[in-house]
C-alpha cells in the first residue's frame, strides 16, 4: 500500500 495521505487526495 502507498501512503494514506495519498488517499486523502
UniProtKB/Swiss-Prot annotation:
Superkingdom of the source species: Eukaryota
Tissue distribution: Nacreous layer of shell.
Entry protein name: Uncharacterized protein IMPP5
Gene source species: Nautilus macromphalus
Origin organism lineage: Eukaryota, Metazoa, Spiralia, Lophotrochozoa, Mollusca
